[in-house]
Amino acid sequence: MNNTRVPLIFLGTNTNIHWLVDIAVRIGYDVAGIIDDDYHEQKQFQNIPIIATQNDLIANREYYSRYQFFCATNWQPDNTLVSGHTRNRQKYYKLINILQSQQFNIATIVSPSAEVSTYQVHIGHGSFIDSFCVISPMDKIGNYTNIYSHVNIGENSIVGNHCVLQRHTQLAGGVSLGDRVYMGFYSLVSRHDTHIADDTFVHPSMTVMRDTAPGEVISLAGRDLRKIYNRVVEQ
């Protein structure tokens, strides 16, 4: 899963970048720095060097082919009330497109403090498995998916590409998540064999006990994150 023989560059960044760096270094990665045009003029981000521009990657592809990359820009579901959400989402896919179009080596980061079964588990490239997560036997994790601390995924579950499972998300066994699913903090899919469709947004602390439709928002308050949570959605 973790290929530490090739030096690592973070493409894009976020306010929690040092946690990614800490885990990468603990695993044994040699972190060369960050490439992020938003911060290139500053020459660093939170004391981590900004080493090039995104155009440099394309113009000097042969040089950068000796590195591997991890996209560190986060995305959130689109929210017209928070302009930064839409921009981060657009930036995220732009950076992923650079990595794919230039066929760069893609890193996967799995914390040594995560509990990952050795039995028929697949974790896709570009994904992040945080500390104290449980990945159970026969689980399949897609590409570019971020699974944050204390997430517990039951056996024989599938998580698609470009998903975000925020802290303390819980999935029962046999659950399947499509692509670009966003599970909020403390959200729960408690019924076995439930399917969470592409682009579903499950708000924090919501419990889901049925299949969802593509693009569905699971909340009693639409997209207003200020409203009350901790309710069960069953019908």
Where are these regions (language model features)?
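Short, flexible hinge/linker loops that cap or flank conserved catalytic cores
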Residues: M1-N2, V121
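A solvent-exposed beta-alpha-beta segment
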Residues: N2-W75
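Extended, small-residue-rich solenoid/repeat segments and analogous flexible loops
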Residues: Y63-K140, Y144-N146, N152, S157
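Glycine-rich hexapeptide-repeat left-handed beta-helix
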Residues: Q166-Q235
